[in-house]
Structure formats: C-alpha cells, structure tokens
Amino acid sequence: MPLLYEKVMAHENDLQAGFLLGNEAIGRGIIEAGCSVAAAYPGTPSSEVMESLVRWKKKLDHPIYLEWSINEKVAFETAYGASLAGARSVAAMKMVGLNVASDSFMSAAYLGVRGGLVVVVADDPGPHSSQTEQDTRFFAWFAKAPVLDPSTPAEAKDMVLRAFELSEKYLVPVLLRPCLRVCHARQNVSLAPPRPVVDAGPFKKNWTRWAAIPRYRLVLHKELNEKLEAMRKDEALARPYLVAGNTDSKLALITSGSVSSHVRDIVRSDGLADGDMAAGRDCICLWQSSMALA
C-alpha cells in the first residue's frame, strides 16, 4: 500500500509537506539526515519505519543500505559496524527487541561511536501487541545513554536529525523512543531534501577502544560519565519546549513523550488551555521535556 501522502499531495516530486504516520515520519527523517545504513527487525509498533524507508529509498533514489535483519541483535550490530566506520546509521526495533540487542547495546555505550548512531526503539504501553509494557527509558538509564522522547509524528521526524547530531557531538549511541500513539498517529509533517550521504571510508583500528579489555573499559566508563555530565550542562539540550500556557502561572505540568498529547486534551477539556481559568483554579503552564539522561 502506498504512503498516504502519495495520494493526497498534488506534486509528488516537489513535496514540502505530507500527512504521515509517525513511523513514516521517522523514516523520512532518517533519509533527510543523510543516513547510510539502516537495519531493523519487525515488530509492532516499529515495523513501518523500515517499510517506509524502502519506499523513500525507491522514490528518492537514495543510496541508503537497508536490511531486515534476522534479529534485533544483528540489526544493532549491523548499524553499529557502519557507525564504527564513520557512517550515519540506524537500528530499529520494538522495546522487547532491545532485550535481544542489549549485550551489544550496553557495550556500545562504553565504546562510543564514530558516525552518528540512532537506535529507534518503539514502546508499547497498554500493551497493544507486546508481552510486556517495559519502558525503554530505563534501558537508557541502565546503559548510560541519552534518549529522545517525541510527543508527535512531526517531532519524531525532527528528533531524528537532532539524535544524529547529539550522537556525533558526544560520540555516543542515542535512543529515539516513540510510543505506539506516536508511531501510529498521523500528522502534517514538513519535508526537506535529503542531506548528502558521506562516504564513511575504511574502518580505523584502535584496539584500546573498539576491542577494549577490562583495563581500558574503566577508562571508557570514566569518559562516558564525563560525556553525560557535559550533556547535562548543554543548554541546547536542557532547555524544555514550551508547548502552551502562561509563564506567569503558579502551576506547571512537565510532561514527556506521547503523554503530552493526553495532558493537552485534559487541559483543554477543563477550560485551562491558553492561560484560561476555570473553577477558581490558576491557569496552567504546560511544558514538554523531551530528553532524559542517565
């Protein structure tokens, strides 16, 4: 089935916006960011990320290498190998898939990356199609890796590029954690031309890092802690997004990810949106926090 935007846009070869599923928006963000390699293992709510990448690749004649891997560990290691050679890469899976990939993922957090590495892990609170409701943010805390938590399809697309930039700035893998209600929601999404794919070149050996023995792992752990501390002090990352409300309010609601949409609905239904007052309560200032650090 073709993507919905292909039906509703009049000029398919000159698109500036599309009405996209969250996973389609993530796929588009991956293409626009100049990603070289993407590997995935299917599982709701993440499957459409790779499916959309296949269509974007064909439509835009993009050189990205795509792979349905035999499992999530192989998908992650395929993407990580490309990153070690200097290429931008993505691994995509659902949250229980990160259990399978966890051995490699935990080690990669210590070793770091060369090219930007984004791990798209779709969570399924509910659950709708999963055996657990596990929260990937706890895995990020466990591995000491940053995680971006989008609240809408458009934000998910924008966060793909942000995740690549964060990964390359601090040389760490970055998790993107869209929930089912982001993955399978639709929204008008701005589109941009893809960035050029940079040739990664040959892999550069460094056994004290890429094949580090425990002695050097201690050094890498110290470096990882220093990276996290630097990220905490990074004003561009620490600044939350103001979504709605009045900055003079006495009450602030701090939300993260897909729950932000539910909170906005509740605020509006109670007549508190846009600084209004109802039932004698103070107006509400609604913020959204989109990044978590270990």
What are the roles of these predicted feature ranges?
Residues 2-23, 150-294:
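Flexible, low-complexity linker and terminal segments
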Residues 2-153, 158, 179-181, 245-250, ...:
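Thiamine diphosphate
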